Regions:
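N-proximal low-complexity "stem/linker" segments adjacent to membrane-targeting elements
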Residues: 1-34, 244-288
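A recurrent flexible, glycine/aromatic-enriched loop bordering the glycosyltransferase active site
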Residues: 83, 91, 141-165, 338, ...
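Donor nucleotide-sugar recognition loop
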Residues: 175-191, 226, 353, 421-477, ...
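Short, acidic, metal-binding catalytic loop of nucleotide-sugar glycosyltransferases
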Residues: 33-42, 287-297
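C-terminal, non-catalytic tails of nucleotide-sugar-dependent glycosyltransferases
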Residues: 1-9, 224-266, 383, 395-422, ...
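Nucleotide-sugar donor-binding/catalytic module of glycosyltransferases
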Residues: 1-223, 237
Length: 523
């Protein structure tokens, strides 16, 4: 690996910035040792002493800096805070790239190598992040295995965290670190960087070991008073810079953030419901839907399958489109879209029942965003377990619902079940999209069975550059029977069409289990 690193065509200088303040000397020694052990050798380490007061550290620092000519010791005259220390290091950094190493954490020996190796393949990238775990007295545990770039997930939490590689000039262009966000200064910086670039890459390897200590947020974010508040302010400032009317709340149970956007215009939504119910059953279904929907501008279109005399053409609050011999559900949905003119479309299974009246408004907050193609909800079974919370591709066949069977209010691994985030696909049991997007990608593929057509629709949106959003805030009960039989013919079509993304879903780390989509480490 060291020999390969020396043969890289591009061998940029990496400036590692490590602010130091009253660090236990053994821990700082471990951090420095991990840098000295790097197989990629073109680096510099800047130790920025932020006015330390402990005698043993002050005595040790010069000797530690003298261990290697690539280590530089910088002293601040007084304790100024982590942002000031990092900015000082940034001013003095000579590298084209900067990385950040906390004074008590540890790098894997190939941490720099893996990042520079990625640059050989993708020289245009601006930001690189990798996976991490916790460092304890017993060793390494609690790996955090991250998805590829997920902008909605990033507004729910700073999942990038460690290890971060950034172009030095880009960090300077966005203004460096802002002291008013100390405690979450890295989150604020990364939010500003994300406003300038989407050239963001992920290395799915644990390259950083975050020390868990009594006063570290690696153990509990509450160990650093003000960190949540600083993160909240950073997200608010980010949304304001983007011109988005929104407010941010904190889930104090999970310490995740929730962005609620202002609905700029409640555009008309056609709620498209396939049904084979008789008149009375359908009437009850519609009455329940209307009573639990506060969104002000929608109509209901029922796709009636079966005999003509089951339902009148109009039954009060909805319109009926009839199909005696429809090829499949995809064909009926495509036809229904052609018969409506609303700018937004909601595909809703008759077995779905809203729990809270603002469910459709919550989904509309996301579909109004130009970068979003489709929005899915949290679907809950009659047993109060998760029926659907976004699809993970390539798990147990073509796809499996994330956290399927988990208690409905369970946080999920690393709190992900209760966070707004991106997936490659969401369920057509409750899916909101825009007409222009639906038409751009050609609608549902009528050659595919219902469940796979939903996934295929989302993947076509992803290929066209749109995001798929899952929001756990929109909650519905789902009485839709699970499809027990696999359609091998349709699965073969999907595997041929989407082989790359089925092999590796970008929103599901390759080191996670492929047996179940529960986000636990694979064996």
């Amino acid at each position: 690996m060291r020999v390969e690193a020396r043969s890289f065509v591009s061998q940029p200088l990496i400036s590692i910035l490590t602010p130091v303040f009253d660090t236990p000397v053994p821990w700082l020694c471990e951090a420095i040792e991990s840098v000295l052990a790097q197989v990629y050798e073109n680096w510099e380490l800047l130790l920025i002493d932020d006015g330390s007061t402990t005698t043993d550290l002050l005595r040790a620092l010069p000797a530690l800096a003298a261990r290697d000519r690539r280590i530089r010791l910088v002293r601040l005259e007084s304790h100024q805070g982590i942002s000031a220390a990092l900015n000082k290091g940034l001013d003095l950094a000579s590298g084209e790239w900067v990385a950040f190493l906390d004074h008590d954490d540890v790098l894997e020996p190939d941490a720099l190598y893996q990042n520079v190796r990625l640059l050989q393949e993708n020289p245009a990238v601006d930001l690189i992040y990798s996976d991490e775990d916790k460092l304890t007295e017993q060793g390494f545990d609690s790996p955090i295995l991250k998805p590829d770039w997920s902008p909605d997930f990033f507004l729910s939490c700073n999942y990038l965290c460690h290890l971060i590689f950034l172009r030095r000039d880009l960090v300077r262009e966005v203004g460096g670190f802002q002291p008013e966000f100390d405690g979450s200064q890295d989150y604020d910086l990364l939010l500003r960087v994300s406003e300038r670039t989407n050239r963001i890459q992920h290395i799915p390897r644990v390259l950083y070991h975050w020390r868990r200590s009594d006063n570290s947020s690696a153990s509990d974010v509450r160990q650093k008073p003000g960190q949540l508040e600083a993160s909240w302010r950073a997200i608010e400032a980010h949304l304001k810079r983007r011109g988005e009317a929104a407010h941010v709340t904190v889930d104090w149970r999970t310490h995740a953030f929730c962005v609620r956007r202002e609905l700029l215009e409640p555009r008309k939504i056609s709620v498209i419901i396939p049904s084979s119910h008789d008149s009375e059953s359908l009437k009850r279904l519609i009455e329940n839907l209307i009573s639990k929907t506060s969104y002000p501008n929608y109509d209901i279109v029922v796709l009636q399958l079966g005999d003509r005399d089951k339902v009148h053409d109009r039954c009060g609050d909805f319109r009926v489109l009839r199909f005696r011999d429809a090829a499949n559900a995809s064909a009926t949905k495509n036809y229904a879209v052609q018969q409506t003119d609303s700018p937004w479309l909601l595909f809703l299974d008759p077995g779905a029942e809203p729990i809270e009246a603002d469910w459709l408004t919550i989904m509309a907050e996301h579909v109004q965003r130009s970068e979003v193609g489709a929005v899915g909800a949290r679907l809950i079974s009659p047993k109060d377990t998760i029926e659907h919370a976004g699809f993970v591709l390539g798990v147990n066949g073509i796809a499996q619902s994330a956290f399927h069977g988990f208690p409905a209010e369970h946080p999920g691994v690393n709190r992900q079940l209760q966070m707004i985030r991106n997936y490659s696909a969401v369920s057509g049991v409750c899916m909101l999209t825009r007409r222009d997007v639906f038409q751009q990608i050609g609608g549902f593929d009528e050659a595919l069975s219902d469940g796979l057509a939903d996934i295929d629709l989302c993947l076509k949106m992803r290929r066209a550059g749109y995001l798929i959003v899952y929001t756990p805030l929109a909650k519905l009960y789902s009485n839709t029977p699970a499809r027990e039989e696999r359609d091998l013919t349709n699965e073969a079509i999907m595997r041929q069409r989407w082989s790359d993304i089925l092999e590796q879903d970008p929103y599901y780390n390759p080191n996670l289990s492929r047996a179940r989509a529960d986000f636990v480490v694979g064996k």
